[in-house]
Amino acid sequence: MSKDVIEYSKLFAKLVNTNDDTKLDDTIASFLYYMFPRELFIRAISLLESSDMFIYILDRVHNKEGNEHTSLIDVLVDEFYKGSSNSLLEYRLIVKDTNDGAPPILVDIAHWFCSCEEFCKYFHEALEKTDEKVELHDVLINEVDDHLQFSDDRFAQLDPHSLSKQWYFKFDKICCSHLLAFSILLRSSINVLKFFTVNSNKVFVIAIDNIDEWLNLHINIVE
């Protein structure tokens, strides 16, 4: 399905019921179910409701006594939805692996990467299918340099701040439930973000204001 026709982020934005913001819209959810293979959408929603997703923020400014959680959500809103962040936000998207003893899963929607086995599997398959004469970049990334063809879709978009070109990762070739879940959360709407982080409190936003703890987080991921 062409990204010129379907704007996935706008569909994600409609996931929360407009008449009751404590519920998901079943019609939109059913529609999205058929738009992704391997039951990816169902697995992504299950992940969002699993309490296994975490957003860690290196927080030097907003970690105040009192309304800390709300202020952290505001930081995410500024970064992902308003584009009004005054400085580069340092954050990490982490999923707790359900396998005992396995390291946490690192998710990077900005560069369309995930450390999970599913992502690695499809990435290696793409490598094996790629002709040596063809650049992997051309196989996995859709580059748009015609302004008339620019899209408002933010799903699987790389470097969204560029004014001269747009790049989209071809998610139909490589996608996993972790990337889809965090994209639904951070590339949709403020209502969807707050639905999972505040209303249902299933996705946890955690501030780290100590650089040693921040570095330790990365060590745990590598291990």
Swiss-Prot record:
Family the entry assigns: Belongs to the SHU2 family.
Function: Plays a role in a RAD51/RAD54-dependent homologous recombination repair (HRR) pathway to repair MMS-induced lesions during S-phase. Required for error-free repair of spontaneous and induced DNA lesions to protect the genome from mutation.
Subunit structure: Component of the SHU complex composed of at least CSM2, PSY3, SHU1 and SHU2.
Name of the protein: Suppressor of hydroxyurea sensitivity protein 2
GO BP annotations, alphabetical order: DNA recombination; DNA repair
Organism for this UniProt entry: Saccharomyces cerevisiae (strain AWRI1631)
Location in or out of the cell: Nucleus
Alphabetical UniProt keywords: DNA damage, DNA recombination, DNA repair, Nucleus
An annotated GO cellular component: nucleus
Taxonomic superkingdom: Eukaryota
Disulfide bonds: none
